[in-house]
């Protein structure tokens, strides 16, 4: 895999979000550090971690929630939908694990099977250290021996999140994909609210719930890798021609722009999930590639190998 710099920038009337990810090259995969849980875990105090003329970034160390507020408009964008964060209700595990996770990850185990992680349910520890204009969080998934460091930095346009892949540690399980701030660009389920996805020249997904089933979207930026055999698609969608996504609104909204590394990215969205009560759109970055091959076993029967 070629070394890639992955950058995502989200622009809005109320706030802008910049997310930077760096993928590892194939030559450097062996140089990834082996997983070691540190003897002590640093924990930053809750409160303001950065501010400028326009924006303030806050960190809640108890609920592991990062949120940014606009001083002029009062608009708040949060890693956990802000109403849910303030409610303190965590009785539904499915809802809590989805909405309270600032990071999703997928890894491949020793048997070659993909497994999913979320920071709320699966992170044994989240180390938090204040840095210049922001905070560094390291997510330790001790059971599967994977750690992922992410730096969140406030800037004049909004917030950036960056992963230094040289800081990722692994054991026998291998990190495959990372999704940062999956509910930062989210809206309440309502027929008047919408998600913008870049299907073809662009499409809108209404965020209504109860009227129809949950709708999901997941498409690779610029289409599938031409080197791999195409898989059968059950939904008719157009290729993604522009690395963008967002939340439209009358007075404020979010526009996500992947400015580098878009060839590794997927745009994902979920609309109308009643248990979440929120609809969201975000980006996934795949740090490793995979392919599916059809082979024949000794009995001349077909078998699918990932």
Model-predicted regions and their roles:
Residues 2-11:
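Bacterial N-terminal signal peptides that target proteins for export
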Residues 49-306:
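Carbohydrate-recognition beta-sandwich/jelly-roll modules
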Residues 25-29:
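Bacterial lipoprotein signal-peptidase II cleavage site
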Residues 16-19:
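Hydrophobic alpha-helical transmembrane signal-anchor segments
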Residues 21-23:
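C-terminal motif of bacterial Sec signal peptides marking the signal peptidase cleavage site
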Residues 11-12, 42, 151:
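Generic detector of short alpha-helix boundary/capping microenvironments
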Residues 31-42:
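Short, Gly/Pro- and small/polar-rich lid/capping loops
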């Amino acid at each position: 895999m070629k070394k890639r710099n992955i950058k995502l920038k989200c622009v809005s009337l109320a706030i802008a979000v910049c997310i930077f990810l760096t993928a590892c090259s194939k030559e450097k995969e062996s140089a990834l550090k082996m997983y070691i849980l540190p003897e002590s875990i640093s924990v930053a105090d809750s409160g303001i971690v950065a501010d400028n003329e326009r924006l303030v970034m806050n960190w809640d160390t108890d609920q592991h929630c990062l949120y940014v507020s606009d001083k002029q408009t009062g608009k708040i964008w949060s890693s956990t939908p802000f109403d849910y964060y303030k409610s303190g209700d965590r009785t539904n595990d499915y809802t809590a694990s989805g909405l309270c996770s600032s990071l999703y990850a997928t890894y491949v185990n020793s048997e070659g099977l993909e497994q999913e992680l979320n920071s709320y349910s699966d992170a044994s520890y989240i180390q938090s250290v204040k840095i210049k204009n922001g905070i560094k969080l390291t997510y330790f998934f001790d059971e599967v021996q994977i750690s992922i460091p992410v730096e969140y930095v406030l800037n004049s346009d909004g917030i950036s999140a960056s992963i230094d892949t040289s800081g990722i540690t692994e054991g026998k399980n291998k990190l495959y994909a990372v999704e940062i701030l999956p509910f930062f660009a989210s809206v309440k389920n309502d027929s008047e609210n919408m998600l913008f996805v870049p299907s073809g020249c662009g499409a809108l997904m209404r965020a209504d719930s109860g009227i129809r089933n949950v709708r999901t979207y997941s498409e690779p930026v610029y289409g599938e890798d031409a080197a791999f055999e195409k898989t059968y698609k059950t939904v008719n969608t157009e290729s993604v021609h522009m690395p963008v996504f967002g939340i439209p609104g009358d007075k404020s909204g979010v526009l996500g722009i992947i400015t580098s590394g878009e060839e590794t990215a997927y745009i994902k969205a979920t609309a109308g999930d009643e248990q979440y009560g929120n609809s969201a759109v975000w980006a996934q970055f795949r740090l490793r590639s995979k392919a599916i091959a059809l082979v024949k076993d000794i009995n001349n029967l077909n078998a699918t190998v990932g």
